[in-house]
């Protein structure tokens, strides 16, 4: 049968085994990312936001002095903290996915590249 260009049974079995292992590892990674708390802060550190490794918002902390500086200042600080947390969270996710896939370029949505 190998003469017809079909893979031998051993290769096919190995491919399925690897696919199952990647699926199990991906599930474990998903759980690890869900459990992570990644902090991002404004430049002055008066606004902080925590996201999971899957970019789910977890909590926000604002220094009381920030609230006395007006809405525009507070909003800018919160946005900066959110951007920082998002960048760190997506970088962590991308790094962990590369570890999982052994550096294969799978061109996954949301993973940039």
Curated annotation (Swiss-Prot):
Protein name as catalogued: Nucleoid-associated protein SynWH7803_0026
Subunit structure: Homodimer.
Keyword Cytoplasm belongs to the record: yes
Family, similarity comment: Belongs to the YbaB/EbfC family.
Superkingdom, taxonomy of origin: Bacteria
HAMAP family: DNA_YbaB_EbfC
Role played: Binds to DNA and alters its conformation. May be involved in regulation of gene expression, nucleoid organization and DNA protection.
Species whose genome carries this gene: Synechococcus sp. (strain WH7803)
Gene3D superfamilies reported in the protein's UniProt record: Nucleoid-associated protein YbaB-like domain
UniProt-annotated location(s): Cytoplasm, Nucleoid
């Amino acid at each position: 049968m190998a003469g017809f260009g079909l893979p031998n049974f051993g290769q096919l079995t190995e491919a399925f085994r690897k696919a199952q292992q990647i699926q199990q590892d991906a599930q474990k990674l998903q759980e690890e990312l869900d459990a992570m708390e990644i902090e991002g802060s404004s430049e002055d550190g008066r606004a902080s936001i925590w996201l999971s490794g899957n970019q789910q918002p977890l909590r926000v902390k604002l220094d009381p002095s920030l609230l006395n500086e007006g809405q525009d200042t507070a909003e800018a600080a919160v946005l900066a903290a959110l951007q920082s947390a998002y960048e760190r969270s997506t970088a962590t996710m991308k790094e962990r996915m590369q570890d999982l896939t052994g550096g294969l370029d799978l061109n996954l949505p949301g993973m940039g590249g």
